[in-house]
Amino acid sequence: MPNSEPASLLELFNSIATQGELVRSLKAGNASKDEIDSAVKMLVSLKMSYKAAAGEDYKADCPPGNPAPTSNHGPDATEAEEDFVDPWTVQTSSAKGIDYDKLIVRFGSSKIDKELINRIERATGQRPHHFLRRGIFFSHRDMNQVLDAYENKKPFYLYTGRGPSSEAMHVGHLIPFIFTKWLQDVFNVPLVIQMTDDEKYLWKDLTLDQAYSYAVENAKDIIACGFDINKTFIFSDLDYMGMSSGFYKNVVKIQKHVTFNQVKGIFGFTDSDCIGKISFPAIQAAPSFSNSFPQIFRDRTDIQCLIPCAIDQDPYFRMTRDVAPRIGYPKPALLHSTFFPALQGAQTKMSASDPNSSIFLTDTAKQIKTKVNKHAFSGGRDTIEEHRQFGGNCDVDVSFMYLTFFLEDDDKLEQIRKDYTSGAMLTGELKKALIEVLQPLIAEHQARRKEVTDEIVKEFMTPRKLSFDFQ
């Protein structure tokens, strides 16, 4: 029986498959960010066209005319048509940004609800961080299990990281570290911070020496966030792998229990990717297990790990959670943050490789003012008259989005939202409010960073016992 679907729909289906393969090959071939972004935008556009024509989402295993397979919302679920999210690329067609409720369903995580936030407040005796109150950290895996342990006086530790791809970090990179510092303070727990200089050497056009030097420079910015030197260990993969047999043994255990087929499915690796990329996920997984750090935890294997990170890193830890029980370790818990949008809009996250999309921690007050005024996408109207009459749209306005991250005063933020939405506040006034928040925040960070000496960095990065006793 001939296929009743129009040929154009099948052609569109095949075009999506071809474009998806192009995106994967560009990533594998270390293409430029612009090339990758352009290919991803085309992929998103094709998927939207397919949905409009077919009346349903594109599914790779379901050509037009075939019944859709049972929906799978687990780790291998098909990408939602509007949003493309993996550890290297974040792209959406919506001016409002990624649909995080859909992402929770697709990734199989749990929403951070009011009940969980209240429980964190009861457990710590501290008001929840505004990142929690405002839904910036919005999703979790097993956070209730961590709180069970904490309430029963059982230890846990924090693990987060940074991929040092450039000497200068941007303000978006601060988000997990600001929140992790708060977690360390309120729970009084050890913290390990992985600098994946090996990853950046494998993925970027860098020498080993460059990747390591970026790790050290980025460590200074991380230390400037205020972490306690007696409770924090920062390590470079290039350094620590050779120092710690416990760490390397866990890497090998993970490598043995994860197949090439699995990592291809999770990360989209192709046959042209170097073997270093294929084995790297095991290195990012290893800090999730306490005996990777015998100097801190001795040989204990039962201490649970809590990982605050942006949700694009979740594929690494879905793999980690899958392998953990098979090698005798507890699954790490996770707290996921939203993405920090680029100045040009929430369709993609801020990137250090695009100076006009980013506000760097090295920027001067003048540069910050210029970037916000010139590049920050506005939710305002075309004319002052229209804006006064109809008001602005905070859902797409980047300046307002940034204020939700960095303006701690809830009442002030709500007043700005009301004034901008009603038209009482103009776009220029909203941008001015953001500039007045960002300029001192970055200046204070720069002052703290100047106080971070090479000796302080060395102490943070030296494997050692922290101020906790693990028997």
Swiss-Prot record:
Induction: By IFNG/IFN-gamma.
Enzyme category, top tier: ligase
Principal location class: cytoplasm
Motif 'HIGH' region mapped to chain: 164-173
Domain of life: Eukaryota
Example GO molecular function: protein kinase binding
Effect of E455D: In a breast cancer sample; somatic mutation
Subcellular location: Cytoplasm
Residues annotated with Phosphoserine modification: S351
Residues in WHEP-TRS domain copies: 8-64
Swiss-Prot/TrEMBL GO biological process terms: angiogenesis; negative regulation of cell population proliferation; negative regulation of protein kinase activity; positive regulation of gene expression; positive regulation of protein-containing complex assembly; regulation of angiogenesis; translation; tryptophanyl-tRNA aminoacylation
Disease affiliated with this protein: Neuronopathy, distal hereditary motor, autosomal dominant 9: A form of distal hereditary motor neuronopathy, a heterogeneous group of neuromuscular disorders caused by selective degeneration of motor neurons in the anterior horn of the spinal cord, without sensory deficit in the posterior horn. The overall clinical picture consists of a classical distal muscular atrophy syndrome in the legs without clinical sensory loss. The disease starts with weakness and wasting of distal muscles of the anterior tibial and peroneal compartments of the legs.
Family, similarity comment: Belongs to the class-I aminoacyl-tRNA synthetase family.
Protein known as: Tryptophan--tRNA ligase, cytoplasmic
Organism from which the protein derives: Homo sapiens (Human)
Lineage, uppermost ranks: Eukaryota, Metazoa, Chordata, Craniata, Vertebrata
Chain's gene name: WARS1
